[in-house]
Amino acid sequence: MRQLPADFFRTPYAFYRQLRAEGSVHQIRLRTGVRAWLVVDYDAAKEVLRHPDVRKDPHSATGAQARQAAAGNSGVTAANQRLSHHLLNADPPQHSRLRKLVTPAFAPARMEALAPRVTAIADELLDRIDQAAGPVDLLEEYAFPLPITVICELLGVPVEDRAQFRDWSVAVVDTPMSTPAGMRSATDAIVDYFDRSVAARRKHGLGDDLISHLLTASDDGDRLSHDELISMAFLILIAGHETTVNLIGNTVLTLLADPPRYRALHQNPEAVTPLVEEMLRYDGPVNVATLRYTAAPITLGGTEIPTGELVLVALASANRDERHFADPAAFDPDRSSNHIAFGHGIHYCLGAGLARMEARIALTRLVRRFPELRLAVDEGDLRWRESILLRGLLDLPVHPAGAPVDSTGAPARR
């Protein structure tokens, strides 16, 4: 049984390349001691992501591993159980029902209509960076506050509550800073907050925020239950910004490692769309897809996975599969890419369009304002999140060097 190498979180790709050379799926033991099956090639990954006998709800599978995962990932507190009634934990027909109810709130036109506001938020954050006397942490000052502000505005969260939302988000995501007690406290607080938010809307009237839209979502009289609504708000909070933080940070790091490419984006901002798509493939924000379980034996690449087993799909590995992508270790925005960074099948990320749009705006506004941005530390000194699910930096110190411009393109006043 394989173990994750010591440098896995910093650079997982050599490990993945070795695994792909040996087979499509491997048994591994995580650092928590949990045993799982890791799927590493593109075709097998897509097969698992759409396989009818691979489930999201561990209670629909049987076996020791599924029971262990269910015990470890739910039931910690009553709040945790209430936050589990969302799309990522559901299988058909429940998943189909939930997705039908919530999809209108994420309509492409509604997401694209946010672009002017996202641009304004980006420029406000860059204005603050422009006033810094020395190096700044681009994650702390830009990549994190941009999407969390967007999500909070979407959810109708008041400005004074957004710092608390950020703290809760950090606590519940798998990071070295997370503790069981901290996660329990954060989930309890999130449930209490959304309970009060829903009650306030029902008493005082609805707005144009996502919680209000979810409250009124209906399909032939079917509506979200209270706990389903709370769970969806929680999912939007966490999934709605974590991937974007990583996507922005990973992309900026990749560009700063190749200064001519960074400057080229400054000269040709329209190139941002294929650049973001290639970044999603090359070093995307999600390392491994969320947990899945076998409800019946399945065979992948000649290997049978028994019933009731935990299955992890390594999206980061699948997107560098040599049998599907030419020279996959090269960053090439000109390639025609059909990556699976946002998943595949019925669980394809509902917020993919929002994440893409935020990343495009974040990058073009950044390079416009700071065309000579550069790293403030050696790349080897950067710290990566120790999360099996997420692929992202803990910090990104940069010098906002050069002659910045303001939002109109004129030289900015210092």
What are these regions (language model features)?
Residues 1-414:
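Cytochrome P450
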